[in-house]
């Protein structure tokens, strides 16, 4: 087996380290983007829940909902 030149080993090491750093940077960027999108979705869901609750209040559904919470066994 031929010995590898120390200069060549240093070059390979540098290339691998650079590649790993680039990959880590890209994964960090993607992770930040995903977390940002999840936060946006969470805010949108909160807004939707609030709007639905407001619409239900306007329609008087909350009053009907309280009546429907009686277990079916007790309704008869």
Swiss-Prot record:
Q: Cellular component GO terms, alphabetically?
A: axon cytoplasm; cytosol; nucleus
Tell whether Nucleus is among the UniProt keywords: yes
Pfam families found in the cross-reference section? HSBP1
Which Gene3D superfamilies would you find in this protein's record? 1.20.5.430
Q: Does the keyword DNA damage apply?
A: no
Q: Please, one GO biological process term?
A: axonal transport of mitochondrion
Q: Where does the source fall among the domains of life?
A: Eukaryota
Record's subunit section? Homohexamer. Associates with heptad repeats of HSF1 trimers and probably also HSF1 monomers, and with HSP70. Association with HSF1 trimers and HSP70 coincides with attenuation of heat shock response and the conversion of HSF1 trimer to monomer.
Protein name (database record)? Heat shock factor-binding protein 1
Gene this chain is encoded by = Hsbp1
């Amino acid at each position: 087996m031929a010995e590898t030149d120390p200069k060549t080993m240093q070059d390979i090491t540098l290339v691998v380290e650079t590649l790993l750093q680039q990959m880590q940077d890209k994964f960090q960027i993607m992770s930040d983007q995903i977390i940002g999108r999840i936060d946006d979705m969470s805010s949108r869901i909160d807004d939707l829940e609030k709007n639905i609750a407001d619409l239900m209040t306007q329609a008087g559904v909350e009053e009907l909902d309280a009546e429907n919470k009686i277990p079916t066994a007790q309704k008869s």
